[in-house]
Amino acid sequence: MTLDDIERGIVLTIDKPYGWTSFQVVNKIKWQIKRELGLKKFKIGHAGTLDPLATGVLLVCVGKATKRIDELQGGRKIYTGTIVLGATTPCFDLERAIDAYYPTAHITESLIKETALRFVGEIEQVPPMFSADKVDGERAYSYARDGEQVEIAPKKVSIDSFEITAIRNLGSDTPVPPLSTLSAPASDTSEKELYRHPQGIVPPMLPQVDFRICCGKGTYIRSIARDFGLALGSGAFLSSLRREQVGIYSLSDSIQVQSGTDVSF
């Protein structure tokens, strides 16, 4: 990257690593640019947050490209991942441990595929409590981490497609382990290291559904997982998520980011 790139503005397609916040990725790039180009002040930001436990395309805008953030956030997004059926977590992913089990014996492959089709189109979803959506001027996750329950207004989102690509463990009668065995000891995990050591553990006998979703701005895939479980008459949470594409930007053009090494622009 050169000073001319900063002057013109540049969009970096980053493959966000597992366990990193979007802010951590931006901060790493920011300090590397400062060090390499000797800049003290310049604009930098990302177009569309990715959850810490998700990986994939994160668009980092540098210089004049920050003016395009709103435009880039509006690009259609493609996600792949896995939904676990028969259990829930408070945050709808593995940031927290399983808090309840639900029946799955009635769930069939045809029911799963038929239910996925019901999510295609313009739908309403309620963002997770563990999210950056604001409630009375405060981020929802601030209330969630304090144990407060607040009402988050539903919002309309657009789903172009919801494809089921694989189904595993359907019809398993294996008993699930006690809830107390499914979380890492809190004393072993500091707040700083929370995302590098997720609290939730997936019991291998629970049904798992791999998917591919194409959707519009503001869609929470964690909320889709929660709502998918409810629509199946059970519970569900997201166990993995990868963003494959945002608009014209895809993983095939992405830059890798790692701890302890510089980013190759």
Question: What does each model-identified segment do?
Answer:
Residues M1-F265:
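Catalytic/RNA-binding core of pseudouridine synthases
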